[in-house]
Amino acid sequence: MLGWVITFLVVALIAGILGFGGIAGASIEIAKIIFFIAVVLFLVSAVVGLARGRNRV
């Protein structure tokens, strides 16, 4: 449990530095880009997984 506390402390410190440091706007844009890339990769992998599942029968 102590490991989780340390992990969340580090995440909170990084978020505070980014939020109060003035680069929050750039971080938001990067997060949006990464989010949409992750959604596209998820959809591609889901379609490929479904296509492979049908051919194995």
From Swiss-Prot:
Recorded topology in the membrane: Multi-pass membrane protein
Pfam families, per database record: DUF1328
Main subcellular location of this protein, as a coarse class: membrane
GO CC annotation, single: plasma membrane
Positions of transmembrane segments: 4-24, 30-50
Intrachain disulfide bonds: none
InterPro entries to which the protein is assigned, alphabetical: DUF1328
Subcellular locations according to the entry: Cell membrane
Keywords: Cell membrane, Membrane, Transmembrane, Transmembrane helix
Family (UniProt): Belongs to the UPF0391 family.
UniProt cross-references to HAMAP family, sorted A to Z: UPF0391
Name assigned to this protein: UPF0391 membrane protein RPC_3278
